[in-house]
């Protein structure tokens, strides 16, 4: 009250209270009904930056394709390397391609922005705005709009969004507007679990207005899962996958390949089987989870330093 009176005395107005669709502080714009993805199961993959989301997403897309599903993977990162192991190359981004035609989308053909990758997986890199400018939500929206205009979602069984780092602003939370389930990639360490906790809070905020629900988490590049499991037990979450820390996964990325294209070594075969199991579980449908994210202080007490 004192602050408001001081502003009025100087002829200034109090700052507005921002309250959007997702609660106080939100300016998230509600998507129009004609932008909804229908007929496909839609997953959004999140996690701490550098945790292996793109590797996980690409191998999961390959696993879905091995189950006979028609898959579309959408990379949502300015690095545009989400589909790198599926296509064996860095694709140009949707935004770069639109710039080349002065944003006249009607001049584009599907082959201009979609590349067919391993085992028929359709790959697209949405990209992102230049550093410090624009909004990732706009990029995702333009990509979905382009796919709808070219009817590329009509015969698709699975759409998988691979989303930039652990950014949980309204823009990079945009894929949650389209997703049925959100999957979090984590590791058995404090920083990864801390990021997962923030992502859970973001998904829970979105679930008030959209259909998205949490499917669970995958412990990636982790020998053990005790810290992940301890966190999940406390907040009411679930680990639904575990990818061990094996060198074969690193080597597959260096060779620009998914694990399904690598030699039949024992550790590779085991990892493939885990991806197939995870794909089967996700496609069959997982129970919607509603964990209660912890306050920062509580995470430190649970997993932090003694």
Curated annotation (Swiss-Prot):
- The residues that hold [4Fe-4S] cluster are 135, 169
Recorded E.C. number(s)? 1.3.7.7
Which UniProt keywords are given for this protein, alphabetically ordered?
Answer: 4Fe-4S, ATP-binding, Bacteriochlorophyll biosynthesis, Chlorophyll biosynthesis, Iron, Iron-sulfur, Magnesium, Metal-binding, Nucleotide-binding, Oxidoreductase, Photosynthesis
Q: Give the cofactor note text.
A: Binds 1 [4Fe-4S] cluster per dimer.
A GO molecular function annotation here is: oxidoreductase activity, acting on iron-sulfur proteins as donors
**Species name:** Jannaschia sp. (strain CCS1)
Catalyzed reactions per annotation: chlorophyllide a + oxidized 2[4Fe-4S]-[ferredoxin] + 2 ADP + 2 phosphate = protochlorophyllide a + reduced 2[4Fe-4S]-[ferredoxin] + 2 ATP + 2 H2O
PROSITE patterns for the chain: NIFH_FRXC_1, NIFH_FRXC_2, NIFH_FRXC_3
- Name its co-factor(s): [4Fe-4S] cluster
Annotated region Disordered: the residues are 1-31
Know the name of this protein? Light-independent protochlorophyllide reductase iron-sulfur ATP-binding protein
HAMAP family referenced in this protein's UniProt entry, alphabetically: ChlL_BchL (MF_00355)
Q: What class of enzyme is it?
A: oxidoreductase
Q: Where does ATP bind?
A: 50-55, 79, 220-221
Q: Record's SUPFAM superfamilies?
A: P-loop containing nucleoside triphosphate hydrolases
Task: State the family it belongs to.
Answer: Belongs to the NifH/BchL/ChlL family.
- Self-association state and partner proteins as the record states: Homodimer. Protochlorophyllide reductase is composed of three subunits; BchL, BchN and BchB.
The role this protein plays is: Component of the dark-operative protochlorophyllide reductase (DPOR) that uses Mg-ATP and reduced ferredoxin to reduce ring D of protochlorophyllide (Pchlide) to form chlorophyllide a (Chlide). This reaction is light-independent. The L component serves as a unique electron donor to the NB-component of the complex, and binds Mg-ATP.
Q: Which Gene3D superfamilies does the entry link to?
A: P-loop containing nucleotide triphosphate hydrolases
Give the UniProt record's GO annotations in the biological process aspect. light-independent bacteriochlorophyll biosynthetic process; photosynthesis, dark reaction
Which residues does the record give as Mg(2+) binding sites? Answer: 54
Q: In which pathway does it act?
A: Porphyrin-containing compound metabolism; bacteriochlorophyll biosynthesis (light-independent)
């Amino acid at each position: 009250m004192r602050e408001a009176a001081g502003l009025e005395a100087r002829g200034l107005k109090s700052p507005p209270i921002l309250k959007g669709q997702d609660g106080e502080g939100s300016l998230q714009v509600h998507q129009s009904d004609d932008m909804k993805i229908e007929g496909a199961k839609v997953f959004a993959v999140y996690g701490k930056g550098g945790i292996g989301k793109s590797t996980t997403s690409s191998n999961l897309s390959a696993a879905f394709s091995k189950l006979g599903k028609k898959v579309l993977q959408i990379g949502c990162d300015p690095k545009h390397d989400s589909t790198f192991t599926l296509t064996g190359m860095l694709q140009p981004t949707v935004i770069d391609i639109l710039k080349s035609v002065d944003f006249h989308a009607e001049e584009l053909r599907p082959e201009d922005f979609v590349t067919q990758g391993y085992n028929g997986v359709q790959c697209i890199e949405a990209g992102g705005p230049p550093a410090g400018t624009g909004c990732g939500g706009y990029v995702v929206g333009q990509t979905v709009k382009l796919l709808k205009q070219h009817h590329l979602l009509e015969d698709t069984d699975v759409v998988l969004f691979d989303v930039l780092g652990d950014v949980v602003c309204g823009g990079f939370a945009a894929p949650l507007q389209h997703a049925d389930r959100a999957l979090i990639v984590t590791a058995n360490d404090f920083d990864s679990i801390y990021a997962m906790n923030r992502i859970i809070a973001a998904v829970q905020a979105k679930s008030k207005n959209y259909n998205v629900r949490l499917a669970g988490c995958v412990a990636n590049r982790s020998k053990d899962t005790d810290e992940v499991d301890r966190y999940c037990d406390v907040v009411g979450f679930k680990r639904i996958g575990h990818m061990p820390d094996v060198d074969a996964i690193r080597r597959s990325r260096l060779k620009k390949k998914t694990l399904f294209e690598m030699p039949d070594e024992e550790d590779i075969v085991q990892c493939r089987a885990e991806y197939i199991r995870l794909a089967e579980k996700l496609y069959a449908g997982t129970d919607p989870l509603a964990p209660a994210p912890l306050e920062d202080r509580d995470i430190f007490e649970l997993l932090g330093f003694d």
